[in-house]
């Protein structure tokens, strides 16, 4: 018996190499084999042309397509279908009429949308881009139907509403707390007496309201006076509409432009012209050195800010000295704190529990 013409390794020597050199360029083409026709089963109207299904040309407008769809839908609707004499097209039986109706509906859904129709026309003109047509078809079908912009807008509005009520709740808690502080409560009570508000509340409630109701009304009067006389700053300040997320996004371009203008003025006035810092600029530098937010810095007492200005903490060297003093003062407080002493004693004698894997 003679030896085979080619061994499993594509032949030996020069013959095998020649076969490999001839087949290698053809491998990509073999991997990309695709149907030659433009109409593909499973895409749009399948192997039927959507334009032919509706009986319209490719240049037909939306009105003509809609009119053709209504005529065919009435004709092939399963509930209204009646076979016509000599009807040789699809839909000669109720079952085939239902299939024809679904095909007509698919053709109309494909051609009524401009983007889908554009993809379909491109598929008819470029049948060779087989995998690209699959991608565009299923990417549109699987894309979310809800507009992402609507989802973002609703989410931002929901967060803004939550912010407003949360801040308002914090503000009311701060007012309720200040109403229990003797210093502010006495002052508010004196103002209420001077304005005759407490007397009016008692007269108004006489013979009509219980003592508890009168007490609640007086409490509300005191809280209203505190609201009008005390400017709460920081995290418990009165909520402002412009601080909500929705308005922050709307005003973001304005804030960005304002910051750029402010920064350019700062560079021009203080870095180029060498002007002396004003009180506002000094407090800004101090706040940045302390790494505090604007709301945190605004919540500080006025006498603290005056101390910062007197010690000229906007100068880096002075701030470093002040920072060192604060650290030393904190160490002294901790050294004299009984709880801190107990903690250090416990750490020295017992220390934290240890895990060990040594057998006893």
Curated annotation (Swiss-Prot):
Q: At the top level of its lineage, which domain of life is listed?
A: Eukaryota
What are the GO cellular component annotations?
A: endoplasmic reticulum membrane
Q: Does the keyword Transferase apply?
A: no
Topological relation to the membrane, as annotated: Multi-pass membrane protein
Picking any one GO biological process from the record gives: protein folding
Keywords recorded for this protein, A-Z: Chaperone, Membrane, Transmembrane, Transmembrane helix
- Residue ranges of every copy of the J domain listed in the record: 49-124
Q: Which SMART domains does the record associate with it? A: DnaJ
Q: What is this protein called?
A: DnaJ homolog subfamily C member 25
* Origin species: Homo sapiens
Phylogenetic placement of the source organism: Eukaryota, Metazoa, Chordata, Craniata, Vertebrata
Write the gene name: DNAJC25
């Amino acid at each position: 018996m003679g030896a085979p013409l080619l061994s499993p390794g594509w032949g030996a020597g020069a013959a095998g190499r020649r076969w490999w050199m001839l087949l290698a360029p053809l491998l990509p083409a073999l991997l990309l084999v695709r149907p030659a026709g433009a109409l593909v089963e499973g895409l749009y109207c399948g192997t039927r042309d959507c334009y032919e299904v509706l009986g319209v040309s490719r240049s037909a407008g939306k009105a003509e397509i809609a009119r053709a769809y209504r005529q065919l839908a009435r004709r092939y609707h399963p509930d209204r279908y009646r076979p016509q004499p000599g009807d040789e097209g699809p839909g000669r039986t109720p079952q085939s009429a239902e299939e024809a109706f679904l095909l007509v509906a698919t053709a109309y859904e494909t051609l009524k949308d401009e983007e889908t129709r554009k993809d379909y026309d491109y598929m008819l003109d470029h049948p060779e881009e087989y995998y690209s047509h699959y991608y565009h078809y299923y990417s549109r079908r699987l894309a979310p139907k809800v507009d992402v912009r609507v989802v973002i807008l609703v989410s931002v509005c929901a967060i803004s509403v939550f912010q407003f009520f949360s801040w308002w709740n914090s503000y009311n808690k701060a007012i309720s707390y200040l109403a229990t502080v003797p210093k502010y409560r006495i002052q508010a009570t004196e103002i209420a007496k001077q304005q005759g508000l407490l007397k009016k509340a008692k007269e108004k409630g006489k013979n009509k309201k219980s003592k508890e109701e009168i007490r609640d009304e007086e409490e509300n009067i005191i809280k209203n006076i505190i609201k009008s006389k005390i400017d709460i700053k920081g995290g418990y300040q009165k909520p402002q509409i412009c601080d909500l997320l929705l308005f922050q996004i709307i005003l973001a371009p304005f804030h960005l432009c304002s910051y750029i203008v402010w920064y350019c003025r700062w560079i021009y006035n203080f870095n180029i012209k060498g002007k002396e810092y004003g009180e506002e600029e000094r407090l800004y530098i101090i706040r940045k050195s302390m790494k505090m937010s604007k709301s945190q810095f605004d919540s500080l007492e006025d006498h603290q800010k005056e101390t910062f200005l007197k010690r000229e903490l906007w100068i880096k060297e002075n701030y470093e000295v002040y920072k060192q003093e604060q650290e030393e003062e904190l160490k002294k407080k901790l050294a004299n704190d009984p709880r801190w002493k107990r903690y250090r004693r416990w750490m020295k004698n017992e220390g934290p529990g240890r895990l060990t894997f040594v057998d006893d």
